[in-house]
């Protein structure tokens, strides 16, 4: 800030699409240097860069349930809080007790769950330009074998239904109220639709995959085409879940 250089903070980058021209300014990765996890009773305190899978496994080893849904999400806990990540009917807001952030002036703030304005794939963190540094999760006692059994079941379901063999930025569009994005895309006849190296997954139409040589421009064009065709056929507006950053 002293030198007026723009900066961006990344976790694992799981739900991001970076423009083909890259990101102007400094990019700060939060994963390796900020991945500490501590357990205290039923609470887990994790630095923002800690991976969800690692936290879920730590919770299981300590007989703490509540993180099962997140075990297969390939992201950091900081990023998961920012977008209120979720799967299989559960969301981060179900287990967050409080979050520590830095504001634009570098002051540390402690925010409880209600102060985060958590909704479907939403929090107030981006609009307030906060940087998540640490998260406190409140979990519940549960038998470790039951936890691991559920985690295994959910991961198998994920592998069965999602195109994990191809690179993607995860679920491409948010779920419109009363609909499922993937089904709308499929019903619009767009299964397998391709622009350059980007393709609507034939396995799950809610995912846009990289077949090997896709550019960010390919993916953006495909997303526009899909959104336009779904709106034209069904009158439903698809809102991107993928966050686009950098220069396109």
Outline where the language-model segments fall.
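Structural signature of FAD isoalloxazine-binding scaffolds in flavoprotein oxidoreductases
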Residues: 17-35, 82-113, 127-134
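A generic local secondary-structure boundary/capping motif
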Residues: 16, 56-59, 67-71, 84-91, ...
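Hydrophobic, well-ordered secondary-structure segments
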Residues: 52, 56, 70, 74, ...
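Anion-binding (especially nucleotide phosphate/pyrophosphate-binding) glycine-rich loop
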Residues: 1-77
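Residues embedded in well-ordered beta-strands within globular domains across many folds
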Residues: 38, 68, 100, 242-243
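Phosphate/pyrophosphate- and phosphate-bearing ligand-binding catalytic cores of soluble enzymes
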Residues: 16, 102-229, 233-248
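Short, basic and Ser/Thr-rich N-terminal targeting/leader segments
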Residues: 3, 10-12, 95, 166-167, ...
